[in-house]
A protein has these predicted regions:
Chain C
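A hydrophobic, multi-pass inner-membrane permease signature
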Residues: 1-293
Length: 298, 566, 293
């Protein structure tokens, strides 16, 4: 037993500095989730604020528009996750097929640029280019004989616009992980496949995809943690009264609540609700992966 | 990829979700002015010699210097607007030197943060229990600090030390509402931060060059406004009849002024015939307003895409000759009209302000609120509570009294904004209106000897624009000069006693804290859908019903309880 | 090299064209920001600048660079990146290495893993977070920007998965040769997972460069703001409802789009330039067998 511990000692020592950091900066403040069960008032602090049990949660669930907001959040977030994964992976694979290193590097640098512009900036640009009367998109659609919809002002198009613009902004940055994974595939696998007479499609199918599969599974699992995060900044900037019924999400709702008065208890309760949902999904997928594929994600 | 920044996003979200913007303070500090009327604005004058009305115990020298000097800690919001002289800073400028040399008070800023995060940082400061000696808090924080007994009673300090000028502002201007707003159970618990009542009113801004082209007379009724809008749309390709922003209320291109034409007063609390405070947006007059707006939208007088346009987009449309008619505040000549003039004055662009106009034979009343922005309070147990009063005395004296040195304490010729740096910052609520009247009189008499330094600056602008056609001076000239918004519009509102002043100015009542956000969303969503014709006008009736059911009734009761306690 | 089939040629042509269009679409907004930054303020406010400056001038750049706040903030951010990124990367490697082992080799692995993962899912909110950092005496110190986020758990999990892809045989051989785990991490895992290390370095770098909220809340002096916190104070949209004459006079100065655009561009430039340098690690594959322990 002692021998075992000694053998594992270097592992422990490696983990401890990082462990210390998360214990101090993540676990200590985590005690603060108790304010989810309080009518928290800053001037009274955690100890003297009134305890109200699950009232904050009940308040959230009893909102007249709660189902609508929850549905919007789920639809937008899940669509973003799925579309984002497909776009990033697809882009990484397409880029990987190209031979010219200079071209590859240029493309890769360019697609990563929009990540660095905030939604505050891009919001104004989007309103211009998507304007049905004078936007460039409407002009292009008109060229094809299509009448431009009001992308930002019509309830049915708004979620679609959110998802597409988010994917456009982030796919290049999201592809970095997959590009790293592609690079990590041992080239000898490809050589072996070529000797076996596999063409490019078969190489992609039998070498490339299995090679990045663990990272894809990991990213899918982790992104489950975001099914209730539909992207506050973007929605907040683009939301307008005419698209509230399909565009209002949990985060914008909490923001509006906070405008009237600092609702720390409520905001913490919403955070806790999201955490619990995320945890359930992540743990489920972790268990499924290890049970059915015998693969440990973490 | 949404997941990469899971952690970052949580923080961003927390920040945004919890950031309690100052917007609310102004949006909800409606007022209580039980005598109604004009807030005594015109009676105000910035002289410091009006008689003291206080039954003061022992009156002491309002500018008495501390020997040796004392220190007072405070916290500050900063702004991108800040600009300092070389070597100066928030901790070292004309104001800090005046405090130290004239009063013996060393002001120490424990923290400074950008104005957008001030409320958030103030909340974490309050929660951590580490209060500075002096702080500016929102009405809601004021309420919390009162309940937890963390702030000092300033009654005695005020009675002893308040200068006549401070007393006049607190007790006489705006019907004494500033003192009343800070007084709880007979004790004065802070110094009220206050804006101007008349400046919250809507003003019609009209492109007069377009009006002439259309060969139409100046508008005298709301029907005229509709005709003008029709003409503007017809005569100018790409133009809309009237500008409207997506938030409908507050800011540039809003509907308050249009509602006022039908004697509707959305967003504010006013007494009904029985003397009970009721919410303006759910009164029947509002239905008529919306019917008109729906009709205007149908006739193409309103931009089909207004639903996504904020103030900045409206500004673009104005600059690009798409809007020649808006309802907005008195100060808009400075922005965006100034920029629009820079760009288009060569093509003949001109603007003129008009008071809101009525749709029937009754005069239209512009709606506004009592603008309590917050309170300066002293931490309980601080040894020199009177220091707050002295800081206010000195600031009023140096910035706004007859002895004021504007070059040193307000703005110098390079536009260095010294007026942003005082630790306690107050101004006479009707300062601008007085300036507008004085400047116009001086211009007509060609005699500026009676103007103070600030007013002289506006006078120079008026002269430059009207006599020398200097476009860069357009902004101030159209506010303070003859034909400007102060003289032509606000003065009339006040003199003719026309304003409808919202009468609730307290901290949000408990049900507001829980339900106001939902009700606001319902209101904005319903109004927008009615305007664009997605909902029929009768949807307004079911909105009113829902509003009452979803918390409106409780809020009405609580606000009336609040009113009874005043 | 075998001759390309027609299908392959067709596919490659399509691929080149598609990716070029995508890259072009991604470049446009940045070109727009750049064009605005070189335009006159009036043209920018009227929103008539598209992809080419109107009334070309450099005023906004000379103004931005002359503002001491801007250079101060730039310096804070550079310090933050130079100190924060190595801390992130080293801690990430140290944690990821043991956690990438088999449960048999490191029995505590699974407990440690969940301790870390849990922090990705739950947090206590703003006030407890602030109080903790305050209790440690870090408020208004440089370390408040670096220490609270010292372990980027997402990167740990990512790296852990890359480490697992390294063939066990290499590690076993090294152990038999008498190598310690420290040496294995340093001499074998590190070079073999260069693309992954480059990825997490980039994430750490971008994370430090972009974060603004911690600066605004944890710093007591505006001079201590990092760049993005400072920019946030400029970009935030104006509240047109609370405006007096003096403020309105300054609004046109502050609401100056050209100035914002130039500062946004100057702030984004360094981070955009670092990418091509890190990129080479994503470009060439690594031959596992060739590295000797």
């Amino acid at each position: 037993m002692k021998g075992l511990f000694r053998r594992e000692l270097p592992f422990h020592i490696m983990v401890w500095p990082g462990l210390l950091a998360v214990l101090i900066f993540s676990y200590v403040p985590m005690a603060g989730v108790v304010i989810a069960f309080q009518k928290f008032i800053p001037a009274k602090g955690v100890f003297d604020s009134q305890w109200i049990g699950f009232d904050n949660f009940r308040f959230l669930f009893q909102q007249p528009d709660f189902t609508q907001i929850l549905r919007n959040t789920l639809v937008i977030a899940i669509a973003k996750i799925v579309a984002g994964l497909i776009a990033s992976i697809g882009f990484a694979l397409l880029l990987n097929e190209l031979g010219k290193a200079f071209f590859k590097r240029t493309i890769q640098t360019l697609v990563y640029l929009p990540h660095f512009l905030s939604w505050i900036i891009l919001g104004g640009v989007l309103i211009d280019i998507l304007s049905p009367s004078e936007g460039i998109v409407s002009w292009a659609l008109g060229f094809l004989g299509i009448n431009s919809p009001f992308f930002l002002g019509s309830s049915s198009w708004f979620p679609f616009t959110l998802v597409l613009s988010d994917v456009w902004k982030e796919f290049g940055f999201g592809a970095i992980v997959y590009l790293a994974a592609l690079t990590s595939i041992d080239p000898t696998h490809y050589e072996a496949a070529v000797i076996d007479g596999a063409n490019r499609w078969r190489q992609t199918w039998h070498v490339t995809l299995p090679g990045i599969a663990p990272i894809v599974v990991l990213m899918v699992t982790l992104s489950l943690g975001n099914v209730l995060n539909a992207g506050f900044d973007q929605v907040f900037i683009l939301l307008s009264p005419s698209v509230m019924d399909t565009g209002d999400i949990i985060d914008t709702w909490v923001y509006r609540m906070g405008l009237v008065n600092a609702q720390y208890g409520l905001a913490t309760a919403v955070g806790l609700f999201k955490s619990v949902i995320s945890s359930i999904l992540i743990i489920t997928s972790f268990v499924m992966a290890s049970k059915f594929a015998n693969y440990r994600v973490f | 990829m949404t997941n990469i920044f899971a952690k970052n996003r949580m923080i961003t979200f927390a920040s945004l979700a919890l950031s309690i913007s100052l917007v609310f303070v102004s949006a909800c500090s409606n007022g209580n002015n039980s005598t109604s009327g004009n807030g005594g604005a015109l009676k105000a004058s910035s002289s410091a010699d009006s008689p003291s009305s206080s039954p003061a115990s022992v009156e002491a020298n309002p500018f008495e210097k501390y020997e040796p000097a004392i220190e007072i800690t405070t916290v500050r919001s900063t702004s991108a607007r800040f600009k300092f002289l070389d070597g100066e800073s928030l901790d070292n400028n004309a104001w800090t030197r005046a405090y130290e040399n004239e009063l013996g008070i060393k002001v120490k800023n424990v923290w400074t943060t950008d104005e957008a995060q001030y409320q958030n940082k103030m909340n974490v400061t309050i929660a951590s229990g580490d209060l500075p000696d002096l702080m500016f808090v929102s009405p809601a924080q004021f309420q919390q600090l009162l309940e937890s007994d963390q702030i000092e009673d300033l009654t005695t300090a005020y009675d002893q030390y308040a200068s006549p000028f401070l007393r006049k502002i607190m007790e006489q201007d705006a019907n004494g509402l500033m003192k009343k707003a800070a007084t709880v159970d007979g004790k004065m618990m802070g110094i009220t931060g206050f804006g101007s009542i008349e400046q919250g009113t809507p003003v019609i801004w009209l492109r007069t060059d377009w009006l002439e082209q259309a060969d139409l007379p100046e508008p005298t009724s709301f029907d005229d406004i509709l005709n003008i809008a029709e003409a503007f749309k017809k005569n100018h390709s790409g133009a809309y009849g009237i500008g409207l922003n997506k938030d409908l209320f507050g800011g540039l291109a809003t509907i308050e002024g249009i509602a006022n034409a039908y004697h509707a007063y959305p967003k504010i609390w006013l007494k009904d015939d029985s003397g009970k405070l009721v919410y303006g947006s759910v009164q029947p007059e509002m239905k008529q307003t919306l019917a008109t707006l729906q009709d205007m939208y149908k006739r193409g007088l309103i931009d089909k895409e207004f639903g996504v346009k904020d103030g900045n987009k409206i500004a673009e449309d104005i600059m690009n000759n798409k809007i020649g008619l808006i309802y907005a505040n008195f100060w808009h000549p400075l922005w965006p009209l100034q920029e629009a003039m820079n760009m288009n004055s060569a093509d003949g662009m001109t603007w003129k302000p008009y008071p809101v106009l009525s749709a029937d034979d009754q005069v239209a009343s512009p709606s506004t609120t009592i603008p309590v922005t917050g309170y300066y309070v002293i931490k309980k147990g601080y040894k020199h509570p009177e220091a707050a009063i002295k800081l206010a005395n000195l600031q009023l004296k140096n910035a706004w009294s007859d002895e004021a040195q504007a070059e040193l304490y307000n703005t110098d010729k390079d536009q260095t904004p010294f007026y942003l740096y005082p630790t306690i910052s107050m101004e006479p609520p009707s300062k601008n209106l007085e300036a507008g009247i004085a400047v116009t009189e001086a211009y007509q008499a060609k005699d500026f000897s009676k103007l103070n330094e600030e007013q002289k600056g506006y006078y120079d602008n008026v002269l430059a624009y009207l006599d020398n056609n200097d476009i860069k001076s357009f902004g101030n000239a159209l506010i303070f000069g003859p034909g400007g918004s102060e003289m032509e519009v606000l003065k009339k509102y006040v003199e003719e006693n026309r304003m409808k002043i919202g009468e609730f100015y307290g901290a949000p009542v408990p049900t507001q804290q829980m339900k106001q956000a939902t009700l606001d969303k319902l209101e904005l969503e319903t109004f927008t859908k009615i305007i664009v014709g997605e909902s029929p006008i009768d949807e307004f009736d079911s909105f009113v019903e829902k509003w009452h059911k979803l918390g409106g009734d409780e809020i009405t009761n609580e606000i009336n309880e609040w009113n009874a306690a005043q | 090299m075998t001759r390309l089939s027609f299908g392959r040629k067709f596919f490659l042509t399509f691929d080149y064209i598609l990716l070029s269009i995508l890259a072009f679409l991604c470049l446009l907004p940045l070109v727009n920001v750049l064009a605005i930054s070189f335009s006159s303020s009036t043209a920018a406010t009227a929103n008539i600048v598209k992809f080419w400056p109107v009334d070309f001038n450099l005023k906004s750049y000379t103004y931005a660079l002359s503002k001491p706040e801007f250079s101060d903030a730039y310096w804070v951010t550079i310090k933050r990146v130079l100190i924060g990124t190595p801390i992130n990367v080293i801690l990430t490697m140290l944690v990821a290495y043991p956690l990438s082992k088999d449960d048999r080799l490191f029995r505590w692995r699974k407990y440690y893993s969940w301790v870390f993962i849990f922090t990705m899912l739950f947090n206590g909110g703003l006030i407890p977070w602030y109080m903790t950092i305050k209790t440690l005496g870090l408020i208004d110190t440089f370390w408040a920007l670096v220490l609270p986020g010292a372990v980027p758990v997402f990167s740990v999990i990512l790296l852990l998965n890359f480490f697992r892809g390294i063939p066990k045989e290499i590690e076993e051989a090294a152990l038999i040769d008498g190598c310690t785990h420290w040496r294995i991490l340093w001499r074998i895992f590190l070079p073999l997972s260069a693309p992954a290390i480059a990825t997490i370095t980039l994430f750490a770098l971008v994370g430090h460069w972009n974060s603004w909220f911690d600066g605004l809340i944890l710093m007591n002096k505006t001079e201590h703001y990092p760049l993005q916190s400072y920019l946030q104070t400029l970009v935030i949209s104006f509240d047109l409802k609370i405006m007096n004459v003096k403020e309105a006079e300054l609004l046109s100065q502050i609401n100056n789009r050209t100035l914002k655009a130039s500062q946004i561009f100057l702030a984004a430039l360094p981070i955009m330039l670092t990418y091509p340098f890190l990129q080479k690690y994503f470009m060439k594959g690594i031959v596992m067998g060739s590295v000797k322990g």
